[in-house]
């Protein structure tokens, strides 16, 4: 069965196909960028940033506007949430309304824009002798970040460029683990590195509340938030994947995914893990010392720090999601910026801002303000003092060589929603069927969504 969102997407494709042939991309990589003049262009940039992030972005934009030699003016405009931007982009592409010159987009969203003939292949700009990146520049980007916007299923086009990324990490209470170790309740030191150690500590915590807890909330080892990124993270940690890029098919029912979900189901059945009922409930309970472990985005570090300082005041840090593989496999994600198809001059101007936005020094400043990871390794030099004074951020930063991403395919949003719907049925045992059977059904749904989003 195709979801409501999937049906809406198919309708949008059909509507746009009446205006122009969907997917009939011109060969932007062959464009003669060397002779395009970006002088005097205005770049309208749609983004979702607010608060401190929006303030820092405004500074970056102002610095670029004041210093670039071409007289380019960037206008950064908050257009609401990621979903708001996505909806506005698809409507604009369908109706022929004016597009921005730069837009924040997740990879699965940029795939949709591409199918609607709406994006520039950035490869041609990167390869430009006059405007592109040097080999040294390219080598400075973390490989997993740099390759994340390349789409093999569309001939290797690059539909976005990364200004930042976040990572799924395990948050843990250092002091509580130390208490459990001192009491002989667990058999290892430090954070758990394997699922077996994670279960041992989670079950021990549920039976041995933290002495410094500041709330009456019952102690629990782990609180699971129902989210496709949690699903992917626990699957990656067992050496699996949720998508087969070569076959262009979902693998949500792989042996590793089944093992991951059975593991989490077992934790709940033993009373060692619980659900997250309200947004950020796990973060709050972690702060008060009621929950030993959570798994979530590294960009949440400052919010966890606040929760802890207002709660139990314990020491905490982050580590890799416990894994069965030799090395960690960390789920990395984040929105890139894409360049909509407008005019060559405006497209080049947008690229020149992106190029500035992703320079090492600007990335360091952006990383400090946003708590995202910078996309360049050399930014660590400018962040050295911050990294050394923030052990949790340092621990996460050191995991950057071990990254893997969720599928950059159209129609992923309704699949994510379905994963989040199915997870509690497995976790709590309310669906009594074997996990394999439930995930087979989930995988069929996902592949139907993929087909609907890729054909018309």
Regions found by a protein language model. Give the residues of each.
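Conserved C-terminal helix/tail region of periplasmic/extracytoplasmic solute-binding proteins
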Residues: 25-30, 36-38, 400-456
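Hinge/lid segment of periplasmic solute-binding proteins
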Residues: 25-36, 107-169, 313-322, 385-391, ...
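Short, polar/charged alpha-helical segment
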Residues: 31-34, 51-72, 419
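Short, well-ordered beta-strand elements
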Residues: 39-50, 72-77, 102
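Mature extracytoplasmic/periplasmic domains
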Residues: 63, 281-283, 299-302, 306-307, ...
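Extracytoplasmic "Venus flytrap"/periplasmic binding protein-like
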Residues: 63, 67-144, 179-180, 285, ...
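Helix-loop-helix "hinge/cap" segment bordering the ligand-binding cleft or interdomain interface
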Residues: 66-69, 73, 125-130, 149-229, ...
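Extracytoplasmic/periplasmic substrate-recognition and gating elements
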Residues: 94-96, 156, 258, 262, ...
């Amino acid at each position: 069965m195709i979801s409501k969102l999937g049906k809406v997407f198919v309708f949008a494709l059909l509507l746009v196909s009446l205006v122009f042939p969907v997917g009939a991309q011109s060969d932007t990589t062959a464009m003669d960028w060397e002779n395009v003049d970006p002088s005097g262009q205005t770049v309208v940039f749609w983004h979702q940033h607010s608060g401190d992030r929006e303030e820092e972005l405004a500074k970056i934009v102002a610095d670029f506007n004041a210093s670039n030699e071409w007289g380019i003016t960037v206008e950064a405009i908050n257009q609401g949430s990621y979903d708001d931007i996505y909806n506005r982009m698809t409507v604009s592409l369908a109706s022929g309304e004016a597009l921005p010159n730069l837009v924040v987009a997740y990879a699965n969203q940029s795939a949709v824009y591409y199918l609607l003939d709406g994006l520039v292949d950035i490869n041609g700009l990167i390869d430009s002798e006059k405007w592109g990146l040097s080999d040294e520049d390219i080598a400075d980007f973390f490989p997993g970040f740099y390759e994340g916007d390349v789409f093999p299923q569309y001939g290797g086009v690059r539909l976005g460029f990364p200004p930042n990324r976040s990572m799924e990490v395990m948050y843990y209470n250092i002091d509580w683990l130390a208490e459990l170790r001192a009491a002989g309740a667990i058999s290892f030191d430090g954070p758990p590195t394997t699922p077996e150690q994670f279960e041992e500590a989670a079950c021990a915590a549920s039976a041995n509340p933290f002495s410094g807890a500041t709330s009456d909330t019952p102690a629990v080892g782990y609180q699971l938030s129902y989210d496709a990124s949690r699903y992917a993270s626990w699957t990656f940690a067992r050496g699996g994947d949720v998508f087969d890029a070569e076959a262009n098919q979902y693998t949500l029912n792989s042996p590793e995914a089944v093992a991951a979900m059975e593991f989490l189901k077992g934790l709940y059945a033993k009373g060692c893990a619980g659900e997250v009922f309200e947004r950020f409930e796990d973060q709050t309970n972690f702060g008060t010392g009621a929950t030993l472990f959570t798994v979530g985005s590294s960009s949440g570090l400052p919010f966890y720090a606040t929760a802890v300082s207002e709660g139990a005041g314990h020491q905490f840090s982050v580590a890799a999601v416990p894994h069965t593989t030799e090395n960690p496999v960390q789920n990395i994600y984040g929105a890139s910026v894409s360049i909509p198809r407008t005019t060559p001059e405006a497209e080049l101007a947008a690229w020149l801002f992106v190029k500035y936005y992703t320079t090492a020094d600007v990335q360091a400043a952006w990383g400090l303000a946003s708590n995202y990871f910078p996309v360049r390794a050399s930014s660590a030099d400018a962040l050295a003092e911050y990294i050394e004074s923030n052990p949790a951020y340092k621990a996460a930063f050191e995991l950057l060589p071990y990254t893997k991403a969720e599928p950059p395919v159209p129609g992923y949003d309704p699949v994510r929603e379905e994963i989040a719907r199915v997870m509690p049925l497995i976790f709590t045992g309310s669906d009594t069927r074997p996990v394999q059977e439930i995930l087979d059904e989930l995988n069929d749904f996902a592949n139907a969504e993929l087909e609907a989003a890729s054909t018309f």
